[in-house]
């Protein structure tokens, strides 16, 4: 699905080759500053490489309209984005931006259950904790139902027990819908449990890909 060949970005990363297959869960792990967040920004074309090539579904990413790409490849950042208004407003605004049909309240409640966010839909989003806002961002991404989900430490504000439940539920939903997940995680446990492929980064390089057979 994604392929990187001789990709360099400033002095941050240099990746000789990396292939991320479709309909799988790929976890990206490594020490702080190893280039993980830069890598996923390249995949979503938030930044462009200085040399080499990134392709998505066989096409150079630079030749794909950025808006169309980001509707197919949804990123959930570590610091959650929330908008003024209620939980319901925050869920529906993603569909509006993506020009997708609105859904009923039962569907909204369903995605909240998946991310274990037990709050009424009319709750003001400003009243949510950091961990609750992270779960709201995950729920909004699930509603959009893209081809690819990219998560950057999406549960860093959660305790380990809650994190396990949320990640398990979200990944189950993504796999049931035969979608692709690329996730930066600080948790070796999560990577080992859910990663069909694990890409290990160090000093801007992919030093190992586990699970590739």
Give the role of each language-model region.
Residues 44:
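Helix-to-loop junction immediately C-terminal to a conserved catalytic motif
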Residues 149-153:
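Catalytic Walker B motif of ABC-type/P-loop ATPase nucleotide-binding domains
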Residues 80-89:
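Conserved catalytic motifs of ABC-family nucleotide-binding domains
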Residues 103-120:
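Conserved ABC ATPase "signature" region
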Residues 160-162:
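Helix N-cap at the start of a conserved alpha-helix in ABC-type nucleotide-binding domains
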């Amino acid at each position: 699905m994604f392929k990187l060949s001789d990709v360099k970005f400033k002095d941050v990363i240099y990746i000789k080759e990396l292939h991320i297959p479709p309909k799988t869960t790929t976890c990206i792990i490594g020490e702080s500053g190893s280039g993980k967040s830069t890598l996923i920004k390249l995949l979503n074309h938030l930044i462009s490489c200085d040399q080499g090539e990134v392709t998505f579904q066989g096409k150079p990413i630079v030749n794909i309209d950025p808006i169309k790409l980001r509707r197919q490849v949804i990123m959930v950042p570590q610091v959650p984005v929330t908008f003024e208004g209620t939980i319901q407003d925050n869920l529906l605004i993603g569909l509006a931006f993506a020009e997708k049909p609105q859904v009923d309240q039962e569907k909204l409640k369903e995605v909240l259950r998946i991310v274990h966010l037990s709050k009424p839909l009319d709750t003001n989003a400003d009243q949510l904790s950091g961990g609750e806002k992270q779960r709201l961002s995950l729920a909004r991404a699930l509603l959009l139902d893209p081809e690819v989900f990219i998560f950057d430490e999406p549960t860093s504000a959660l305790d380990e027990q809650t994190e396990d439940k949320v990640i398990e539920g979200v990944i189950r939903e993504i796999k049931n819908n035969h979608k692709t997940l690329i996730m930066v995680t600080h948790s070796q446990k999560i990577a080992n449990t859910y990663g069909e492929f694990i890409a290990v980064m160090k000093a801007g390089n992919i030093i190992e890909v586990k699970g590739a057979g």
